[in-house]
Amino acid sequence: YVKFSNERDQKLSIYTEISEAADGQLTVKKVPLQKKAAAHVRNLGTICEELTGMYKEEEIEVNRCRIKGDCAQLEYLTGITLEDKLDHLLEEGRTEELEKLFFSYIQKVKNIHEKKPFEKTPEFVRVFGNVNLRSDLKCTEISNIDFVPANIILSENKVSVIDYEWTFTFPVPSQFLVYRMIFYYLELNDKRGILKERDFYEKAGILPEDIEVYVEMEHNFQQYILGEHTAMRNMYAQISPGRVEVE
């Protein structure tokens, strides 16, 4: 299995390969598509070490990463994602239990990422834009913004986080991480729409005006990933001269 992440800026373009060794063991490998992306891939080793120390306080393990040349080799983890676990609870109508489980992980994010007051840095502005944020937000020095239910693996005796590629070594408000957890679970599957009446954003302390800012941050982040590259889904708008009405 190979997944290409090539609709990106050249310095971020990679592919992910899952392969099986002679002994049947599966491994995951992230490889730069361009020489410019080698530093991005090699950085995963440093990120793994940093997150391992951070997540230890909440008894969360990090998918182990080993750098070989310009490639990152990661263990292939088995288990069920938190996203799938939440979906099973939803299908069984156990929405109270779903909410309790989901918010236990939201609390873990807050415990890990609320160590000091947030202040904007030039690095933050470069990725997320010079957005107008509340003054009471908290953060840490390192921010894995992709700590979403699909990237959390639950097994019999441990909880692990995978796919931590979008970890930044500068402060990002913890509330933005919580926003992404909720957004990427609630908004990307119609069957989860019934949960919107449970007001997850409000219960997490996220106000409508906060959401407006976080939508802008997410847009700026996606533009940072693209760089000068134009994604196929956006290409028509750029090359089409527009519609002409013919009578």
Q: Language-model features: where?
A:
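ATP-binding glycine-rich loop module of kinase domains
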Residues: 11-53, 84-86
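Helical subdomain adjoining the active site within ATP-dependent kinase catalytic cores
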Residues: 169-178, 185-247
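Short glycine-rich, low-complexity/disordered patches
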Residues: 109-138, 191-204
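Short, exposed beta-strand/loop patches in secreted or surface proteins that constitute
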Residues: 15-21, 61-66, 152
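Conserved structural core of kinase catalytic domains
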Residues: 62-129
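Juxta-kinase regulatory segment immediately upstream of eukaryotic protein kinase catalytic domains
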Residues: 1-5
